[in-house]
């Protein structure tokens, strides 16, 4: 085992010495302390995970108190010593000669072929990572208590590709920011803010008009829900939403299609419907993704096919058009940078058309 040490969680101070002695004697693994249950520092959860930081009273005070407790219950010096013993990780880049030798047919041709495929993918992806828009693109980023789930890595990659992210609130702001070239509607808790979202009619109308006018948009999960005609809130009432996507969203009693998936763009005819290029691309490649939601839609889309690696289960999902990609799956852009690149290229086209 590569496990060099463990820390016990939610353990009582009375039990810790006995458990430490037992584990170290029987398993030969260092026990580096424990985290006791501190009632004043408990952070409650809800249907999609933790409460947001800004919703927690006295968060800084709780963290300071927890830090004080951990200074006494963790063996800090031993943890630092163990960390300093870790070897440096080295991943040398393959030279062209190495690539050829690795990929020559041999007794392990299957392994060689796999290495060649991975090298080809990395070479292709490196070209996408370095792409940058020749002009700065103003991209509206929905960011408030209703839309708060996003990966900072995704935002960093968009910035490195030339995006200026302009935050706005579909809950509180009456209008979209001026001179936008694209929209990002990520996940969050629209179901907890259904009434406020419905009452902000001007924002709903402006978002709908912008997308229908051709403004590129990426929408995930909560953002996808917001684009429907109506959405059921946690209070059981249905609220009017942006109306870009025909249909409604409702709450289910359990997590729906939960877990990791692989997305592949449907080609040609799907369910009797002719598929078109998505964000200007006929093939956006394969995208690892995940779904994490209690809600479902009567119009999930058919632009992509989702499959689960551990089973034969699969389903069609996501809406795709020349300027829109919207669905329940959450994407990680570094796993498939073709998607943010295609999105920003469409934003650049849109910017040029607005002159």
List PLM regions with ranges.
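Phosphate-binding active sites in nucleotide-utilizing proteins
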Residues: 134-201, 205-210
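Cysteine-nucleophile active-site neighborhood
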Residues: 190-272
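Structural motif
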Residues: 7, 184-186, 328
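C-terminal and late-domain segments of enzyme folds
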Residues: 3, 134-135, 147-159, 164-166, ...
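Internal gly/pro-rich beta-alpha loop/helix module
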Residues: 1-96
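NTP-binding/hydrolysis catalytic cores, primarily Walker-type P-loop NTPases
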Residues: 57-98, 122-125, 129, 133-136, ...
């Amino acid at each position: 085992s590569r496990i060099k040490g463990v820390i016990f969680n939610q353990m009582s101070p009375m039990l810790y010495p006995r458990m430490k002695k037992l584990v170290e004697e029987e398993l030969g693994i260092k026990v580096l302390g424990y985290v006791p249950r501190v009632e004043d520092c408990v952070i409650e959860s809800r249907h999609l995970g933790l409460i947001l930081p800004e919703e927690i009273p006295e968060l800084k005070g709780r963290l300071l108190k927890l830090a004080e407790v951990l200074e006494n219950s963790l063996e800090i010096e031993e943890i630092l010593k163990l960390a300093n013993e870790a070897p440096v990780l080295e991943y040398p880049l393959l030279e062209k000669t190495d690539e050829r030798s690795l990929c020559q047919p041999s007794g392990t041709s299957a392994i060689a072929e796999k290495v060649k495929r991975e090298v080809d993918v990395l070479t292709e992806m490196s070209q996408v990572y370095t792409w940058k828009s020749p002009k700065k693109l103003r991209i509206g980023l929905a960011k408030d208590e209703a839309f708060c789930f996003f990966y900072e890595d995704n935002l960093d990659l968009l910035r490195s590709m030339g995006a200026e992210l302009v935050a706005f609130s579909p809950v509180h702001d009456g209008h979209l920011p001026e001179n936008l070239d694209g929209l990002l509607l990520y996940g969050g808790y629209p179901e907890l803010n259904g009434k406020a979202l419905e009452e902000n009619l001007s924002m709903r109308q402006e978002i709908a008009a912008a997308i229908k006018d051709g403004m590129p948009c990426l929408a995930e999960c909560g953002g996808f829900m917001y684009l429907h005609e109506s959405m059921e809130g946690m209070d059981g009432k249905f609220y009017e939403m942006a109306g870009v996507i025909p249909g409604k969203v409702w709450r289910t009693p359990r997590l729906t299609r939960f877990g990791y998936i692989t997305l592949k763009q449907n080609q040609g005819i799907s369910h009797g419907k002719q598929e078109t290029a998505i964000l200007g691309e006929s093939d956006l490649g394969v995208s690892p993704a995940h779904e994490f939601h209690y809600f479902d839609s009567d119009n999930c889309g058919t632009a992509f096919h989702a499959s689960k690696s551990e089973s034969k289960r699969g389903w069609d999902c996501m809406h795709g058009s020349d300027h829109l990609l919207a669905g329940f799956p959450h994407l990680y852009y570094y796993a498939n940078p073709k998607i943010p690149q295609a999105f920003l290229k469409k934003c650049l086209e849109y910017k040029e058309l607005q002159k």
